[in-house]
Structures are given as structure tokens and as C-alpha cells.
Regions:
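Alpha-helical protein-protein interaction modules
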Residues: 1-135
Length: 135
């Protein structure tokens, strides 16, 4: 299961979200209790494929399983920024602050492994629309 998930996330980060999501979903099917990061991979792939509702659903699953991991908050802020749902984006950013984290574009760019320039631009654009400061 984990090998499928890792392959899927790697494919997603490298610009092949449509292929990646198939592997991650296979990993979920093979594991009766999939770890939170499987859902994070599915959420990212959905986001990069512009399936924002599914992305939100999967990022929320990550938060349900592990509320202290920062990535789903980052990506939810970006999704909500793309959707123009600024109140929801601000909520995610305030949740990050409760965790003792603040997000900047610079930090968001430096701490993800998104290798595909189109996907990276979408993610950072969403953060900017959400009102995340550059530094």
C-alpha cells in the first residue's frame, strides 16, 4: 500500500496528478485504515486537477486524523484562495497560528516538493489570493 502511495505522490509532485491519484487511491483500497498522508496525496492531486471540492474533502480528512500537521492548512488556504472564499482561507490561516505556525509565500514555496512549475504556480497563486504575505 505505502509503495503505491509514495509513487502516486511522486507522480503528482512531478506534474502527473492524473496518474498519481490512481496509485494513491489503490493504496487507500489496500489499507483498511489508511494513514493521513494518503489523503493528503489525494487532496493534492485533486487540487492540481482543479477538483477543488474533492481536494477540500481530502484535506479535511487529513486534519481529522492528524490536526497538528501543517500541510492541509496550507493547501486549504490555497484552494479557498482560488475559489475566492477568503473567509475560509483566513480561517485556515488562523488555525495555523493556533498551531504556532505562520505561513508566507516564501515558506510555502520552500517547504513543498512540488517540482512541476504549473502546479507550483497554482499553489502559490492560491496562497496569494488568500492574502498570505510574501515574507
Amino acid at each position: 500500500g505505502a509503495n503505491h502511495a509514495i509513487l502516486g505522490i511522486t507522480l503528482t509532485f512531478s506534474g502527473k496528478a492524473r496518474q498519481g491519484i490512481v496509485h494513491i487511491e489503490n493504496a487507500v483500497r489496500l489499507n483498511p485504515e489508511p494513514p493521513y498522508w494518503y489523503y493528503f496525496g489525494i487532496g493534492m492531486a485533486n487540487y492540481f486537477l482543479s477538483d477543488y471540492d474533492s481536494a477540500i474533502e481530502n484535506f479535511e480528512k487529513v486534519k481529522e486524523q492528524n490536526s497538528t500537521v501543517v500541510w492541509p492548512y496550507w493547501f486549504l488556504a490555497s484552494v479557498y484562495g482560488q475559489l475566492g472564499q477568503l473567509e475560509n482561507a483566513k480561517w485556515e490561516l488562523s488555525e495555523l497560528e493556533i498551531l504556532g505556525e505562520t505561513l508566507t509565500i516564501e515558506a510555502g514555496n520552500n517547504s513543498t516538493d512540488i517540482m512541476d512549475p504549473t502546479y507550483s504556480a497554482l499553489y502559490l497563486d492560491g496562497l496569494r489570493k488568500a492574502g498570505v504575505p510574501e515574507k
